[in-house]
Structure formats: structure tokens, C-alpha cells
């Protein structure tokens, strides 16, 4: 297995929260020899230099192995060169686009975002004892979030905001 936890601790990296998609993936996969788990969303949001990250973790890479990872950040494409350098050839991403299955030899697979309002006990009281198949749903959507056009892959959020 690729022991990244020591690096995460040493360099004070952390899993993003409350949307802990990468952390949940890490907890499920950390014992798999080919899983390369790092908090990519934090690396992006904290603007860590990718060359620095590469130099910190490259000793963990066995060039004979092909690794996989999970990235929950919408700007995942910026990591492609780093992932290639780390021999990561498969990435589970939360912002998978239909028809984009490979970028520069890296396979992209979908991974659901951690649903904070459902998965976290302190937020999910409204969902207890609900028959999700048959319940009437008077609300079309319950999450809008922010709208920063430069950050999104499509204009769906603009359409949601236009409906309000």
C-alpha cells in the first residue's frame, strides 16, 4: 500500500469537510496496494505547488505499478501532469463529464460526492423513516450553492439561479 498518511500528517494536509468524498474514499481504499490517497481538493484550494507535492511523495512511487486515486475538486484537470508523474492512471472524480473518459492517458471514472445532508447524523433528521421511492417531492432541488461562472463546466447553475 502507498503510505500517504504520514505525509498528510507531517505537512498538515487535511481532508476537506464537510464534503468528505476524498476522505471516505481514502478510508475505504487505504489498504489497497495500488491506491494513492492524497487530499487533492485541499492541495488545489490551498494552492500548493505541484512540483513540491511531487518531490514530497515521489519516493512512494513504484514505477512498475499503476495507481488510482479519487479527486472531488471541480478543477481536477489541473492535476493531470502530476498524476502522470506519479504513475496514477485511473482517477475517480466527482465532477465526471459525459464523454470525457480519458485525458492524456488517465482514465476518468465517476465517484459520487459525499452527501453531507444525508450521510451526517446531525444533518439528516429530516430523512429518517422516509420511503425515497414513493415520497412526493415538492422541491425540485435543495442545493444551489454559489455561482461563480468561471468555476463550472456547464451553465446548469445559471439556469437554476434564473428559475429563482
Spell out what each predicted region is.
Residues 1-164:
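Nucleotide-sugar donor-binding catalytic core of glycosyltransferases
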